[in-house]
Amino acid sequence: MSETGKLKIIPLGGLEQIGMNMTAFEYEDGIIVVDCGLSFPDDDMLGIDLVIPDITYLRENKDKIKGFFITHGHEDHIGALPYVLKEISAPLYATKLTMGIIEGKLEEHQIKDIVKRKVVKYGQNINAGKFRVEFIKTNHSIADAAAFAIHTPVGVIVHTGDFKVDYTPVFGDAINLARFSELGKRGVLALMCDSTNVLRPGFTPSERKVGKTFDHIFAEHTKNRIIIATFASNVDRVQQIINTACRYNRKVIVEGRSMVNIISVAREMEYLKIPDNTLISIEEMENYTDDQLVLITTGSQGESMAALSR
């Protein structure tokens, strides 16, 4: 290629760890940032609620930053945004549901009105300095996840974000493997790929299989109250729980701050379809017998502050 400039890939978090995902890409006088997540403290980090990446380099070069590009709406990819965007002013790009979740955080931190934002569709390209970022459809445990093909003067970098290959997703389209194939044939300078659980044998089953499991559980426990702990952001799974609850004529209680917030956003954006009179408050539980209730809560990983533990 005729271009002789140097491309820098600068990991700021998320490598060899779960959480705090953040990577900067720099070419000449331009920087773009992919993801901006947090992680939770180790047991010996007393008095610390959360951990965010060290953004010293970005702070020192904030005039070069052309934008933040977010792959999906999990905390380990978006949780640091409110803190970072208070110091660094740059446009924010994400898909519809991801942006909706982010906007809730920005509003909570009272910076929503000062952050420039753009909702991006799959297949759309965003020009940011000498970078061109293409959004590609993927599947993950949250809707609207994206991979990026980052087109630079010296070649294409493919950043997968978190993903799984699900040929039979419950909602929406399957991962766009055809586009990844096209990029591969044309030549890729670097592949930055999710490697969570890569050393474990086997493969991740389709989310559709989880729905069948719910049906078995509900059929087996017709006289009991059912409590299901899951990630708040797993909108597809929450939808399957609600669908199953409706089939078995059960009311649904949602507990946990993050669960309530994300369900509210997803419902407003029509990523969740909940029939009228399905949801009830926790105070209304006493009006129903156990066999009429399903409780969806946070705390599936035993988090001490989650609703299930409390």
Per-segment meaning from a language model:
Residues 2-69, 74-290, 300-310:
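His/Asp/Glu-rich metal-coordinating catalytic cores
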Residues 292-294:
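Loop/turn-to-beta-strand initiation segments
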Residues 296-298:
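Short, conserved beta-strand edge motifs with alternating hydrophobic and charged residues
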